[in-house]
Curated annotation (Swiss-Prot):
Phylogenetic placement of the source organism: Bacteria, Pseudomonadati, Pseudomonadota, Betaproteobacteria, Burkholderiales
Species: Bordetella parapertussis (strain 12822 / ATCC BAA-587 / NCTC 13253)
Residues that hold substrate according to the record: G73, G74, R95, N197
Record bears the keyword Cell cycle: no
Record-annotated site: Transition state stabilizer: K38, K257
Stated name of the protein: Acetylglutamate kinase
The protein's Enzyme Commission number: 2.7.2.8
Described purpose of this protein according to its UniProt entry: Catalyzes the ATP-dependent phosphorylation of N-acetyl-L-glutamate.
Location in or out of the cell: Cytoplasm
Family: Belongs to the acetylglutamate kinase family. ArgB subfamily.
Pathways per UniProt: Amino-acid biosynthesis; L-arginine biosynthesis; N(2)-acetyl-L-ornithine from L-glutamate: step 2/4
InterPro entries documented for this protein: AceGlu_kinase-like_sf, AcgluKinase_fam, ArgB, Asp/Glu/Uridylate_kinase, Glu/AcGlu_kinase, NAGK-C
Length: 300
């Protein structure tokens, strides 16, 4: 199978010049600002999308923005579990994580996936550095207990899954000041050193809050948030989100994504978007063009 060409590579010089001209006011506006990107979905597994993501992140850094990448790795974890004869289980979009699964999560996210992303960014001219929650005490966590919808008095034990208690941003800010691009694996650590698997959407949202990010972009495998008829919802308010939760329009893996996005919007992140990671250069389209892509989340 031949690799699909990057659409940017076939644009005429005039169109490229127009795109650059359109980007200029956004580059000015966001210069020096932090942009947190949750990297996941097809953009992590398709080669052409991996390349466009890496180029986008490096370009954003070169023009004066401060991208911070928080990555997922669900398919890679599932593959590793299958190789040892285990099947992944989810409750309300959160992976149930026993001790053996936690070992796999640490190895896959903090090792294989993180290093692949770091190398990919560095190969196209960036300076990326990988972090887990243990580095600089970045992500401190406690064991998460899920609400049992059938019996709220009996919470569900989902294993080594964590709730964030504190994010210590000093190490991220130090890397940004030295022109590095932080790449963060969603693994937190308890006071006793216990490792916890934390949903990457939750980590991205909290990281955006603590860093005072200008924007939070959540990459997904859909055009954005869709209604029950499959139509893209361009913007969502807090009230609309509550209604979509209640009627089941937002469910499964989209639940933590939207909840974390709304929390970030409520806690000072100026702009929160769910973007289609299957679109090449979706980060540049969302940040540096008039059009944008996906769904905007508002706290109002």
């Amino acid at each position: 199978m031949t690799d699909t060409p990057d659409p940017a590579a076939v644009l005429s010089p005039a169109v490229k010049a127009a795109v650059l001209s359109e980007a200029l006011p956004y580059i000015r506006r966001f210069h020096g600002k932090t942009i947190v990107v949750k990297y996941g979905g097809n953009a992590m597994t398709e080669e052409r999308l991996q390349r466009s993501f890496a180029h986008d992140v490096v370009l954003l850094k070169l023009v004066g923005l401060n991208p911070v990448v928080v990555h997922g790795g669900g398919p890679q974890i599932d593959d590793a579990l299958r190789r040892i004869g285990k099947q992944g289980t989810f409750v309300q979009g959160i992976r149930v994580t026993d001790a053996e699964t936690m070992e796999v999560v640490e190895w896959v996210l903090g090792g294989q996936v993180q290093q692949d992303i770091v190398m990919m960014i560095n190969e196209v001219g960036g300076k990326a550095v990988g972090l887990t929650g243990k580095d600089g005490m970045l992500i401190q966590a406690t064991k998460k207990l899920m609400v049992n919808k059938d019996d709220p008095s009996q919470p569900l034990d989902i294993g080594f899954v964590g709730d964030i208690t504190r994010v210590e941003p000093a190490v991220v800010k130090a890397l940004q000041d030295d022109q590095f691009i932080p790449v963060i694996s969603p693994i937190g650590y308890g006071e006793d050193g216990t490792a916890y698997n934390i949903n990457a959407d939750v980590v991205a949202g909290k990281m955006a809050e603590v860093l005072g990010a200008e924007k939070l972009l959540m990459m997904t495998n859909t055009p954005g948030v869709l209604d029950k008829g499959g139509k893209l919802l361009r913007s969502l308010s807090a009230q609309t989100i509550d209604e979509l939760f209640a009627d089941g329009t937002i469910s499964g893996g989209m639940l933590p994504k939207i909840s974390s996005s709304l929390d970030a919007a409520k806690n000072g992140v100026n702009s929160v978007h769910i973007v289609d990671g299957r679109v090449p250069h979706c980060l540049l389209l969302e940040i540096l063009t008039d059009q944008g892509v996906g769904t905007m989340i508002s706290s109002h």
